[in-house]
Amino acid sequence: MSTDKTYCGFIAIVGRPNVGKSTLLNKLLGQKISITSRKAQTTRHRIVGIHTEGPYQAIYVDTPGLHMEEKRAINRLMNKAASSSIGDVELVIFVVEGTRWTPDDEMVLNKLRDGKAPVILAVNKVDNVQEKADLLPHLQFLASQMNFLDIVPISAETGMNVDTIASIVRKHLPEAIHHFPEDYITDRSQRFMASEIIREKLMRFLGAELPYSVTVEIERFVTNERGGYDINGLILVEREGQKKMVIGNKGAKIKTIGIEARKDMQEMFEAPVHLELWVKVKSGWADDERALRSLGYVDDL
């Protein structure tokens, strides 16, 4: 019997919306798991990303951005998901953006001060800071806010110093058996990942009109005789005008979304994919907690 020690633990990636948490997770894993977009609030579920390297297994929880605005049911549930992720982990990576500091950052920090887990502060997008002279005083200001385990300036986009974060994570994993086989990179189903890929393309190809008012339901996900997958995706929007926007002129927009989503699915599933998309108006879904539960928004709380 092998007596080699193994190390395993859960790490929450937290921060206000749009600071680069999902990009950081994807870089730490070496491939795309969490959806990234320039819009705030693109991550709606806690995605578990798993990175195994030799005896070390880091299980990353990618939270929705914690934010102060809680009026809509979907926002309340997203904040609940983010807060519950902080409570049950060995380590927290708190992501902030360059030299910006907002009331939302302050709110996340206050939640972390109440927690027991040590916190790494990842100062992201430092390569985008115009006035480099402002960076050091800002890092000193951040250091005075809390007793951080470490403060690491990074660029999740380029990968700068992401290996430093990974190294700190490894050092703080407790001795434990691995929770997942070493080839696992997420505990989410292929059906769930298909819906996330479609949603990312919607975010990417549509204007700022649709930050929350769109979601994706996978109605059919089956293997076919060609060794690939037949996938039917239903895109839910809140208003008729949004439906027209998703479809585009003579169906051009939804065609582009479908083509790009299919490419990503084929790469992720390593098999041919036949994808069909429909758009349906379901008014008020983002305000209706029952509808959100039926769409799986609270399946992991």
Swiss-Prot record:
Q: Output the Gene Ontology terms for molecular function.
A: GTP binding; GTPase activity; ribosomal small subunit binding; small ribosomal subunit rRNA binding
Q: Per the record, which residues fall in region G4?
A: 124-127
Protein name according to UniProt: GTPase Era
Q: What ranges does the record give for the region G3, renumbered to this chain?
A: 62-65
Q: Name one GO biological process term.
A: ribosomal small subunit assembly
Q: Family assignment?
A: Belongs to the TRAFAC class TrmE-Era-EngA-EngB-Septin-like GTPase superfamily. Era GTPase family.
Region listing for G1, in residue ranges: 15-22
- Which keywords label this protein? Cell inner membrane, Cell membrane, Cytoplasm, GTP-binding, Membrane, Nucleotide-binding, Ribosome biogenesis, RNA-binding, rRNA-binding
Annotated Era-type G domain ranges read 7-175
**Topological type in the membrane:** Peripheral membrane protein
Entry superkingdom: Bacteria
Q: Which CDD domains match?
A: Era, KH-II_Era
**How is the subunit organization of this protein annotated in UniProt?**
Monomer.
